[in-house]
Every structure is written in structure tokens, then in C-alpha cells.
């Protein structure tokens, strides 16, 4: 796992990444991982090396988190998504898959809506309660909703109401911070969905 800095509208964006041993040639679609509020891209330290075997995986510290510069004033989910979009533009991704965990799932949703040609597949893990069901309904890409037994266990099923065609997986055996360790019960099905 490596780290680097990239420019975005808020300043520098600190990014953790894993690249396949072959240097990224003949790999699957790159994956962008967006962390929960109060955490950093390090919350994916168990996922990065596993999924990074066959695709490039990027886990930025969201603007204002960890080692990333933040906005001068509180930013909306749409504004944070636009800042992450700056990173996608600087990397010149033609297509990318996006995984959002808790608050990161809201940002992932906004990226999917704003960039329908670029975002190929969306994984939403532990979806916060939202009154933005109409926004979720605008996601046109294939969606996989993963429900670990965390503080959002009760709210995550509501996302299924807004996304009735989404695949869904309940993981009552896995709790909060499931990607900080090797969570094969989650990573295996995510890998399978992304390969589809």
C-alpha cells in the first residue's frame, strides 16, 4: 500500500492506494473507496491489499479528514463529491468503480449521479438514514448494498427501498470497521460484484 498527494478544489488530497504487482496492466476497473465520517482512507487497510491484487484501489482521506486539506467552510456532500471528482479527473480514469462506507456511501452516490459515464458500479456499505431517496433513485449503475451489523444496521434497508434492483447482502457477523481487517465475508462478494 502506497500513499500520495493529488490536487483538488480544496487543496491537497491524501490518497492511500494499492496497485497490482504487474503495474496495473491487464487489471480490472480501478476502485475508489470512500470512508466514514471521522475516519480516513486507512479504514480500508484490510481491503486495499486484497482487492489491489487485480485492480488499482484508491482510498483518499476525504477533504478535511486525515492528511487532506479541507474546505474553508463546511461543505455539502455534493461539494465533497465534486472535490473527489477533481481527483478522478487528474487521474484521467475513463471508468471507475466506487465503494462508499457509511458517510462515504452518500458521496459515492453523488459521484455516480454526477458522473454516469465514468462510474461503472457502486457498492454502498452501511447507508446512513437519508431523506434524499429521490437522489438514490437517480443512480443508474448496478448497485450492491452491503449491510454490516454496525450503527447503521437499521437504516441501511431503507436504501433498498429506493434502489429495488440493487443486489443486497446482510453481514450480521461483521461489525463496524469491517475493512480494517481482512473481512473475507465482505470482500469476496464485493470482488464478485465488481467482476460482473
Please provide the spans of the model-predicted regions.
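Alpha/beta-hydrolase fold catalytic core
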Residues: 1-31, 54-55, 167, 173, ...
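Conserved HGGG/HGGXW glycine-rich cap/lid loop of the alpha/beta-hydrolase fold
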Residues: 18-67
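Active-site loop/oxyanion-hole signature of alpha/beta-hydrolase fold enzymes
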Residues: 58-99
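Conserved hydrolase catalytic core segment
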Residues: 94-130
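Short beta-strand/loop motif that positions the catalytic acidic residue
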Residues: 139, 145-147
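Acidic beta-to-alpha connecting loop that harbors the catalytic carboxylate
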Residues: 148-151, 173-175
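Conserved alpha/beta-hydrolase "acid-adjacent" motif
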Residues: 151-157
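Catalytic histidine-centered segment of alpha/beta-hydrolase-like enzymes
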Residues: 174-183
